[in-house]
A protein has these predicted regions:
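Sec/Tat signal peptide C-region and signal peptidase I cleavage site
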Residues: 11-15
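Bacterial N-terminal signal peptides
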Residues: 1-10
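Acidic/His- and Gly-rich active-site-bordering loop/insert found
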Residues: 16-128, 135, 139, 145-154, ...
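Short, solvent-exposed loop/turn and secondary-structure capping segments
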Residues: 44, 92, 104-108, 168-173, ...
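Solvent-exposed, acidic/flexible segments
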Residues: 18-26, 37-48, 74, 128-131, ...
Length: 463
């Protein structure tokens, strides 16, 4: 077999030659992207079965890899696999990722969203960044280890699951914890959420290691009124009462919370950001709560979200007829809770901020999701990430990052499995179109991230 394969782009121009192992990875990646796993049209089970076939072809037996399917959910299956370690006393490590994706309508895309296209240095397709690149890397890593005869000291487990993107689906990680705890029990887990950041020219700036994430909780606030004919306005009005409540929430800010993760983030990013903002970040990293410092840092919406619980109005519904006074008006408030914060406490603060007992406030239903528990900023996790980065990305710092969104890691952390979002794949400043049309990721970044993560897995696993 030739030492390298030449890949041809969708436009017919020759791309950078691939190593044989890279070509094998690309085929796994292609198969995942080209398997529609969106709800309700697609099937995570089919994707899991295809990955199982890959593992079987590499020599994994029935006791080492299998597909699981939650009862009554035939399309919401996933995959569990493992390579047993040589040291029974060493706690296992878990590589977890979701294989479901956000729906993509063919009419909105200039090309089939469920076809992997390589164009102008980018992979394009639904899920190329969220999150099938990482899923492909996990499967590819197991196959590479099998071929190399690599026998880790600690057991390596993999779980590819469904239900992260859709609230209607069974969450695969939650299901495994309830029904197959043995498959995911581990000393720690590596997950999505970490990434590399670049500047406007695509130059790498930092590697974000996600250490903690926020928990999502929605509330409904509602104002009611007897209503009446619109020709006879009354001083009390459900819409006005709701508007007052929304204004109160808008003006309210939850207190800032400092922990090891966000302090580490601001400390390491301060010299990179520079200027007045960098100075304020450095002060915050040292624990300062000076009003001017906090005001400067929180003027950036991302930094603000890393420092406190946030609540924002996302939907409004009011009135029933254009010629009638409204009998009810309601709004949805979406909150992102700082790690470790209790829903009850947030609810109480919202009630106090609204200050009107006539406004009803209720928690929206859901699947009883676990409150995010912050994992420790463990040197045994951070150290190897920095060590491998120095070899692969010299001069690029590893920065602990508090993820302001949420992942399936919240389920694992809640039951005592510290979960970290690993970096390696660099993103563009614009977010790469995740969840949108023409989702894309730099080809070079995917291959570099694959190499980084493979080395990192082996470093954590030991021999």
């Amino acid at each position: 077999m030739a030492a390298a394969l030449v890949l041809v782009t969708g436009q017919g121009a020759a791309a950078v030659p691939l190593r044989v192992d890279q070509a094998a990875f690309r085929d796994i990646y292609r198969e995942l992207v080209e398997t529609d796993t969106s709800a309700p049209a697609g099937s995570c089970t089919l994707a899991a079965e295809r990955m199982l076939a890959r593992l079987k072809g590499a020599g994994f037996g029935a006791s080492q890899a299998e597909v699981f399917v939650p009862e009554g959910r035939p399309k919401e299956g996933g995959l569990i696999a493992r390579i047993d370690g040589s040291d029974p006393s060493a706690k296992a490590m878990l590589l977890v990722d979701h294989i479901d994706v956000v729906a993509a309508r063919r009419e909105d895309w200039p090309r089939d969203p469920f076809r992997l296209v390589e164009e102008n240095g980018y992979f394009i397709g639904r899920g190329v960044i969220d999150d099938k690149a990482l899923s492909a890397i996990w499967i590819d890593s197991l196959i590479r280890m099998k071929k190399e005869g690599f026998w880790p000291k600690r057991t390596i487990k993999v779980a590819l699951t469904c239900g992260e993107e859709s609230g209607e689906a069974v969450n695969g990680v939650d299901w495994l914890l309830q029904h197959r705890r043995d498959a995911v029990e581990a000393g720690f887990a590596l997950n999505e959420g970490g990434y590399g950041i670049t500047d406007a020219n695509g130059k790498p700036v930092a590697l974000y290691l996600a250490v903690g994430e926020k928990h999502s909780q929605s509330f409904t606030i509602e104002a009611r009124n007897p209503g009446g004919h619109s020709s006879r306005p009354r001083p009390d009005n459900a819409i006005y009462d709701l508007a007052d409540a929304l204004t109160a929430i808008r003006r309210f800010s939850f207190p800032i919370r400092l922990n090891a993760t966000n302090r580490g983030y601001f400390t390491r990013m301060a010299p990179i950001v520079g200027g007045d903002m960098g100075q304020a970040m450095a002060a915050l990293g040292k624990g300062s709560t000076d009003g001017a410092v906090v005001a400067k840092v929180t003027s950036d919406v991302t930094y603000n979200a890393m420092l406190r619980t946030t609540c924002v109005a996302t939907m409004v519904e009011a009135g029933h007829a254009i010629n009638a006074l409204p009998q009810r008006a309601k709004a949805t408030i979406q909150c992102r809770l700082f790690p470790g914060e209790k829903v009850e406490g947030v609810e109480a603060q919202l009630r106090k901020a609204i200050g009107n007992p006539a406004i009803a406030l209720s928690r929206d239903g859901g699947k009883g999701e676990a409150v995010a528990v912050p994992p420790p900023l463990d040197p045994a996790i951070v150290g190897p990430a920095e060590e491998v980065a120095r070899k692969q990305f010299p001069g690029i710092p590893v920065v602990p990052n508090l993820l302001t969104a949420g992942t399936d890691g919240r389920y694992l952390s809640a039951v005592g499995i510290p979960t970290y979002g690993v970096p390696g794949i660099f993103l563009d400043p614009d977010g790469n179109g995740a969840h949108g049309v023409n989702e894309r990721i730099r080809v070079k970044s995917v291959y570099e991230g694959r190499d980084y993560l493979y080395a990192l897995i082996k470093r954590y696993a030991g021999r």
